[in-house]
């Protein structure tokens, strides 16, 4: 524990410098050691070389409302950096995704997947754009390090190419099933959950997700109903919540609570986004007014 704390303090010295006095550094260090205060757990984990390479790994929580195909890779990248990712598959977002063209039989040259976070994300974006355009592409995974290989910077062990292969095959299947149409909210949710399932290192779950959906989205309401973990196990990586901004009727709320009870999973939750303005911290409100 003391080594972890010292690594964190050392990294913060690199960035904060003399903005804190030696007495303040010592006070912060002691507070963390005694667990009286706690900094970002992600930064506690990745302070040092990992955070120097990309400071995204320092953040506990992130959020993406997918409205373009690149957003799926953004969610993947954030998850691979160890961040928790919230996403909204509300119809107002998913309906902005383009219409899927019917397959033309045209095939692109084989794409070699690079052995990096960016390489995996680029492969996903290429696949989605290709399938949306009515074309197809084959991927070469020969550059991806094998399962069990040591991850020197982030720690842990590599999962090998199989999770990415499964993700790309699954995404292709869901996209091609909607040729001539658009992805449904449940389709987008499932692809993102499959991304979460893909982001695994050495058998350790590194994905934390929350999915927001429309209150009247019945498919999302029933996404974790019954033995979903047998038919759609990837859905386990995300907690699901319905979101509303205008007060629902008693009947609407009762429908949601009954569905939650019958699901057996305790989901979906319900999130009152309309009340956020009343609970927004003044310091944050003042900050956003400045920028």
Can you say where each PLM-predicted feature lies in the sequence?
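Extended catalytic cores of very large enzyme megasubunits
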Residues: 1-291
């Amino acid at each position: 524990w003391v080594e972890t704390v010292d690594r964190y303090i050392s990294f913060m010295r690199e960035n904060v410098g003399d903005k804190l006095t030696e007495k303040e550094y010592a006070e912060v260090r002691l507070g963390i050691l005694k667990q009286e205060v706690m900094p970002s757990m992600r930064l506690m984990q990745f302070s040092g070389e990992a955070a120097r390479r990309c400071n995204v790994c320092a953040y506990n929580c992130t959020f993406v409302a997918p409205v373009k195909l690149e957003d799926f890779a953004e969610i993947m990248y954030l998850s691979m950096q160890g961040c928790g990712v919230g996403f909204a598959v509300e119809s107002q977002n998913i309906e902005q995704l383009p219409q899927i063209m019917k397959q033309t039989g045209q095939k692109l040259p084989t794409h070699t997947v690079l052995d990096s976070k960016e390489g995996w994300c680029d492969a996903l974006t290429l696949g989605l754009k290709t399938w949306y355009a009515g074309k197809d592409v084959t991927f070469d995974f020969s550059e991806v390090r094998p399962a069990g290989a040591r991850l020197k910077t982030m720690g842990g062990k590599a999962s090998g190419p199989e999770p990415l292969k499964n993700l790309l095959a699954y995404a292709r299947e869901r996209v091609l099933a909607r040729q001539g149409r658009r992805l449904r909210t449940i389709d987008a949710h499932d692809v993102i959950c499959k991304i979460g399932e893909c982001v695994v290192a050495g058998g350790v779950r590194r994905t934390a997700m929350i999915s927001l959906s429309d209150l009247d989205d019945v498919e999302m309401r029933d996404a974790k109903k019954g033995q979903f973990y047998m038919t759609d196990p990837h859905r386990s990586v995300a907690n699901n919540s319905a979101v509303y901004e205008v007060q629902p009727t008693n009947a609407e709320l009762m429908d949601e609570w009954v569905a939650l009870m019958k699901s057996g999973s305790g989901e979906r939750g319900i999130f009152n986004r309309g009340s956020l303005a009343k609970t927004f911290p003044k310091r944050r409100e003042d900050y956003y007014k400045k920028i």
